[in-house]
Amino acid sequence: MTADAVLPNPAAGVADEVAAYPPAVDLRTMMAKRPLPAVAPGTVDASSLTGEEPARLARRVLDKLNASLAAGDAAGVEECFNASQAYWKDSVALTWHLRTFGTPSTIAASLLETSRLRGLSREGFQVDGDAHFDPMFSFIDCHISFATSSPATKAIGKVLLLPVRGGDGNQVEWKIWILSTRVKSLDVHPENEALLRQPGRAISGEQDFETQTLIVGGGNAAVVLAARLKALGVESVMVERYSQAGDNWARRYGSLQFHVPTSSTQTPFLPYDDSLLGRMLKREDLANHMRRYVAEFHLNILTSSRVQSSVFDTSTKKWTITIKTPAGRVTATARHVVQATGLGSQQPFVPKLADEGLYKGVAIHSTEYQNPEVSLKAKGVRSVLVVGSANTAFDVLQDVHDAGLEVTMVARSATFVFPVEYLDNPLALGAYNTAGAGADEVDRNILSLPTLVEAWLTKGLFASLARAEPEKDR
């Protein structure tokens, strides 16, 4: 097969070059080892699990868990969890990190240590609102809330409880299958959205400055973090290499778009315009929203600038950062430095091929691709080989095809392709479109599941949606 142009996908092969820590794992291998737990038919009477009964049962389990934690009883904590499969997923609430623990013994040891370090309140984990029984999976789904004292926080989460028959085969006990915990707010620094409207600082790039937090980058993560910090009363300054916020999108290829529903990508404090909710976000939508975000909230940003070096002083507990700006070099001092420079997908990876010099056609990386006219047709290209099968590869494939060029995709391994409408299903990311469902509430439900469990549920959902459309080509 020959082609006039070859466009490698930016993500293709990166994993082969950079060692991951923790080591990368194959989700399919994990799924094969850990199927979802099965509840035998007739284990519980669904008709009895209505009204206040699910909440009462959940409260009984939580009371036992709280008592065991207070007593430092590892065996008692372990006994609260489902022996065959259990998870605890924490999002900053108790571990100050994003962690998922497996096996009851590991969960028990980790809960005992972190609840002590964070000062879990005397009340412990409490039922928060209603609980309900899911007849399809036979679990009780219950929201929870709790508080800590070190630091003083309010936190939320949920528990999923499974029915387990006791040793005599008759008695049914409810055990925790999944415990999810997530910090909601800091008591000492509650968010104040009114602070977002206060003027920012005049950062010229000519004078040294001091700030509480220096953020390296000016993309989505950077500007959202800057806004969050400002609402908490914490000053920050972003250092962005391009001439304005949003250029990390605006400078990429013209056909770029998100591959998930817009409603599931909302930004805090300033949502996307309603006119964008019915379609996928495109390059211009993303860039314009970032610029609007910075302007409306008067966020501090130093553009066309790059960090040259950084040194941490252990005595003052401060960073000294040297920054190259259009006006020269300035020095910034900050208590905290946050790197918000993305996942590295814009670092080109081009596989080394034997005798690659023999190929005389156009060979570019997708980071160099603009559009079919400028990047390909103007150079006489008529056929294109796209190497890779991630989102960028499909964007380019569609773009080149629509321009009337012959195009072929080469993928290293099988790629799971499904209709984008599946993602918009109310049981998937379409939950964000549900009338009356706030993003925080949907986040609380969707983000509570361990990745492995979410993978199993998504696989089952997509399989059922596919079975409902037998006329579609597979």
Regions found by a protein language model. Give the residues of each.
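Short, low-complexity N-terminal intrinsically disordered segments enriched in polar/charged residues
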Residues: T2-A75, E79, A202-G205, F209-T211
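Short beta-strand edge/turn micro-motifs at domain boundaries
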Residues: A5-P37, S145, P151-S204
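A solvent-exposed, acidic/Ser-Thr-rich amphipathic alpha-helical stretch
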Residues: A55, R59, A67, A71-M136
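Feature captures the FAD/FMN-dependent oxidoreductase FAD-binding
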Residues: R118, R122-G169, W174, R279-S345
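Glycine-rich dinucleotide-binding loop and its adjacent helix/turn
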Residues: I178-G218, L232, T267-L276, K282, ...
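Glycine-rich FAD pyrophosphate-binding loop
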Residues: A227-G254, L405-F418
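Conserved N-terminal glycine-rich FAD pyrophosphate-binding loop of Rossmann-like flavoproteins
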Residues: S243-F269, S275, F416-G436
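Dinucleotide-binding/catalytic capping subdomain of oxidoreductase cores
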Residues: M280-N288, F394-R474
